[in-house]
Amino acid sequence: MVTTAEKTNIGYITQIIGPVVDVKFPNGKLPQIYNALTIKGTNEAGQQLNLTVEVQQLLGDNQIRAVAMSSTDGLVRGLEVVDTGAPISVPVGKATLGRIFNVLGEPVDNRGPVNNQETLPIHRPAPKLTELETKPSVFETGIKVVDLLTPYRRGGKIGLFGGAGVGKTVIMMELINNIATQHGGVSVFAGVGERTREGNDLYNEMIESGVINNENLNESKIALVYGQMNEPPGARMRVGLSGLTMAEYFRDVNKQDVLLFIDNIFRFVQAGSEVSALLGRMPSAVGYQPTLGTDVGQLQERITSTTEGSITSIQAVYVPADDLTDPAPATTFAHLDGTTVLSRGLASKGIYPAVDPLGSTSTMLQPNIVGDEHYNTARAVQSTLQRYKELQDIIAILGLDELSEEDRLIVARARKVERFLSQPFFVAEVFTGSPGKYVKLEDTIKGFQKILSGELDDLPEQAFYLVGDINEAIAKAEKIKG
C-alpha cells in the first residue's frame, strides 16, 4: 500500500537491469532513500503496468537506483515514475487478522479490501534502549520439551532447525494456538521465500484448527504475509519487514504479547545477496552482500520486548549444505536466544514433537533465571538421556542383559523420559484423534522429577507416551494393568 505526496514528483526510467531500475528526476527533486515509487500506465506493447519500486541508492546527476517489488516484465525506458513521498506502508491493527497480504500490504486472499484506516511504514527505527524490558522472563508455551529444556524468552528470538517433514509447521501452529488460547495474544506469520504450496497448506490448516475464524475474521488470531519463492528478490527482501511492522503495532499500540514467525530467515539474506551485485556492491565472503550484518541486524533489533509488550520470534533457519559456519546462519546465530533442533531420528520413532533434547539450547536455562529446581531437573533429564545415548552401542552389540544393574535402571528411566517428552497437540487432534494437552511448567517439572527419582519405576513405559501431565501417565498405566 503506498501513499502519494501532495506535490507529485515525476521522473522517467533510464535503465532496467532485471529487478533493478534506474530513474532520472528533475533538478532538486530527488526522492529519499527507501521511498516507494510507482510505475503505472501502458507500455508500447499495450500491457497495463502497475509496479512499485523502492529507492536504494542516489547515483548523482539526478538519478536514483531502485529495486522492484514485483516483476519488471514489460518495462521500457522513458516510462513515467511517480514518487509517493513515503516508504512502503502496510495496514496494521485488528483488520489484518485472518487475512493474507503481499509485501505491499495488499490482500491476496480474494476476500476484498481491508477495511482499516491505519497504515505504518515498513522502515522504522528499533525501540530505544530506555524502552526495552531488561528483566528476562520465560515465555510458557505449554509444550513440555520446550518449557523444560529450551525455555523461550519473552521477547526473545528462537531458531527452529529442521529438515522437511519433521514437524516444524506443526510446532509453529501449536505455538500460535497456545498463545491465542492461554495468553490471549496474536501471531503474525511472514513467509519469506516460501513455496506457494506450503503457504496455501498453512492457511488451510489454520482454518481447520480454528486459529483463523472464517465466519468472523475479527476473531482470528493470526495475520499472514507472504513473499513467495517465485517473486522477485525485492519482495522477498522486504516481506519480513512488512510482517514485523504488523507485529510491532500489536506490541506498541495494543500492548499485547505477539508471536512472529519467519519462515525462512535464510531466504531473507539470500534475496539481499541477489540484488546486492546488481546495486553495484562488491560481494564479500561466499558471495554474500557486504552489508549482511547490517541487513540482519536491522530486522532482528526490531524484534524485542519493550515495557509495553513483547514480540517473541520463532525463525526457521535453513543451513546451506549443513555448514553452520556459512555467513548467513552464522550471522543469524549471533541474534538468537535459543535453538530448537528437530531430530529425524525421534520423528521416525513416532515421538512428537521431535525436539532433540540434547541438541537444543537456550540462554534462559540458568539457575538465576528459571530457578534451581527447574535448572537441576532439566540437567538431570539431559544427563540421563546422554548416558542412554552412550549405552546404546553396547545394548546393540551385547544386549540389555549385559549392563550393570545401575545402567539398566538409567536405560529404563531414560526410555520413560523420552516418551514423556512427547505430547498430543491441539492442532493435530484432527489427525491423531487424541485431545491436545497444555501442560503448565510446574507440572512438567514435577513429572520429570518423579520419573528420575524412581517413584514410577514399576510403571510400563508405554504409559508415558503421548500424555499431558504425569497424573495422566499414572492413570494410563492403571488402565494398561487393569
Swiss-Prot record:
Record's GO cellular component terms: plasma membrane-derived thylakoid membrane; proton-transporting ATP synthase complex
Which InterPro entries does the record associate with it? Answer: AAA+_ATPase (IPR003593), ATP-synt_VA_C (IPR055190), ATP_synth_F1_bsu (IPR005722), ATPase_a/bsu_AS (IPR020003), ATPase_alpha/beta_chains (IPR050053), ATPase_F1/V1/A1_a/bsu_N (IPR004100), ATPase_F1/V1/A1_a/bsu_N_sf (IPR036121), ATPase_F1/V1/A1_a/bsu_nucl-bd (IPR000194)
Q: What does the UniProt keyword field contain?
A: ATP synthesis, ATP-binding, CF(1), Hydrogen ion transport, Ion transport, Membrane, Nucleotide-binding, Thylakoid, Translocase, Transport
Predominant cellular place of this UniProt entry's protein: membrane
SMART domains this protein is in?
A: AAA (SM00382)
| EC class | translocase
Reply yes or no: does the keyword Transcription regulation apply.
no
Q: Which domain of life is it from?
A: Bacteria
Q: Which PROSITE patterns match?
A: ATPASE_ALPHA_BETA
Its Enzyme Commission number(s) read 7.1.2.2
Gene3D superfamilies reported in the protein's UniProt record: 2.40.10.170, Bovine Mitochondrial F1-atpase, Atp Synthase Beta Chain, Chain D, domain 3 (1.10.1140.10), P-loop containing nucleotide triphosphate hydrolases (3.40.50.300)
Q: How does it sit in the membrane?
A: Peripheral membrane protein
- Binding-site positions, ATP: 162-169
Query: According to its UniProt record, which reaction does this protein catalyse?
Result: ATP + H2O + 4 H(+)(in) = ADP + phosphate + 5 H(+)(out)
CDD domains per UniProt: ATP-synt_F1_beta_C, ATP-synt_F1_beta_N, F1-ATPase_beta_CD
- What does the UniProt entry say about where the protein is found? Cellular thylakoid membrane
Gene Ontology MF: a single term: ATP hydrolysis activity
Question: Family assignment?
Answer: Belongs to the ATPase alpha/beta chains family.
Q: How does it assemble?
A: F-type ATPases have 2 components, CF(1) - the catalytic core - and CF(0) - the membrane proton channel. CF(1) has five subunits: alpha(3), beta(3), gamma(1), delta(1), epsilon(1). CF(0) has four main subunits: a(1), b(1), b'(1) and c(9-12).
UniProt cross-references to NCBIfam families, sorted A to Z: atpD (TIGR01039)
Function noted in UniProt:
Produces ATP from ADP in the presence of a proton gradient across the membrane. The catalytic sites are hosted primarily by the beta subunits.
**What is the protein's given name?**
ATP synthase subunit beta
Q: What is the lineage of its organism?
A: Bacteria, Bacillati, Cyanobacteriota, Cyanophyceae, Nostocales
Q: Which gene encodes it?
A: atpD
